[in-house]
């Protein structure tokens, strides 16, 4: 179909998800911790870098499948680095660390978004509904954790990107949700993606 990628996913879908993830990160993580003028700079920088990462990784992910795992690992490293910067005691007073954390999160999230959405290209309706339901549930849980216990969040920020990368690594490139024994079902994929 015209305007679609090699896997059948329209480009505007993952562009939209990237914008959503960037907005969510900025609202939940930076909205209450930075001054308005600094938050504006971080917001703009993260948005630009996220879109640039999507454009840069688009041909790599959809046309050179052998690099998917490398891309997932690189994105995970960026997200873990972002979590480390956010959890650092120095980040309380260092604007540069906040900016670096936002940029690392923007790039890592953008790449993982593209990777996950590429898995949805050939899933059936039941798999997609399971994925969507668990995505919403995981989003709700993460929001609750952020609001009720923000001091504990760095623990989740370190663990969840690694989990997501491991699940991407174990997935065959030609199947969005493997059904073979021992492979995680669509529910696990929805929950894993929902935390980003």
Where are each of the predicted segments found?
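Helix-to-loop junctions at the C-terminal end of transmembrane segments
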Residues: 51-71
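Glycine-rich segments within core transmembrane alpha-helices of 12-TM secondary carriers
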Residues: 46-51, 124-150
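Symmetry-related core transmembrane helices of the 12-TM Major Facilitator Superfamily/SLC fold
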Residues: 154-174
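Flexible interhelical linker loops that connect adjacent transmembrane helices
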Residues: 170-195
